[in-house]
Amino acid sequence: MEKLTIGVLSLQGNFQSHINHFLQLQNPSLKVIEVRNKTNLRECDGIVIPGGESTTLRKCMSYDNDSLYNALKNYIHVKKKPVWGTCAGCILLSEKVEKNKDDNIENEYGNDFSLGGLDIEITRNYYGSQNDSFICSLDIKSQDPIFKKNIRAPCIRAPFIKKISSDKVVTIATFSHESFGKNIIGAVEQDNCMGTIFHPELMPYTCFHDYFLEKVKKHIKDSREA
């Protein structure tokens, strides 16, 4: 049985929970590895950028003259391999990150803070501090039977997808919040990229990890047939 490899960026954040969720799928063809450098990245058929703190993750990518940052950009935009970002990872996949009043990312990185891949505009820490974290009930828009109904998802210092800038972006799930309104975008995908503002790796279900695995399988199959 041919193996496929999914990597989880393991620089900062709760990467171990993502690894555990993929292992729960009990797929004998799946190998899951920690990714800490561009050598690890070369092994991967798909990669997850976990939650954590987006500016810290970006700084970790800056080591060795931005070598991992540049390798990830090439992975996303040139090789077009599947990438999934959760929370901070979703921020880093956004084409435009709205500047917060306390941010210094524009001065430090210019236009090179995010990796891009999702044509969305996103605001960091939109819902407040750690104390303002909440669990939402997702309204699944995807017709894929992998997704269960009545899914709840934790939003921890979550970003807000302010704008979708391309009709190539597909909404996977939305949710409502008593203070912020209805139909808030929670999960999106565009071509090889997928983003969730919440943390499915902290919940018992594995449907988002299963969905990403299927995305990786499809990419491998399509690449061979091209």
Curated annotation (Swiss-Prot):
Binding site for L-glutamine: G52, E53, S54, R124, I156, R157
Keywords: Glutamine amidotransferase, Hydrolase, Lyase, Pyridoxal phosphate
InterPro entries per record: Class_I_gatase-like, PdxT/SNO, PdxT/SNO_CS
Annotated family: Belongs to the glutaminase PdxT/SNO family.
Gene Ontology biological process terms, A to Z: pyridoxal phosphate biosynthetic process; pyridoxine metabolic process
GO function terms (MF aspect): glutaminase activity; pyridoxal 5'-phosphate synthase (glutamine hydrolysing) activity
GO cellular component, one term: glutaminase complex
Protein name stated in the entry: Pyridoxal 5'-phosphate synthase subunit Pdx2
Description of how the protein assembles with itself and partners: In the presence of PdxS, forms a dodecamer of heterodimers. Only shows activity in the heterodimer.
Listed pathway(s): Cofactor biosynthesis; pyridoxal 5'-phosphate biosynthesis
Ribosomal protein found in the keyword field: no
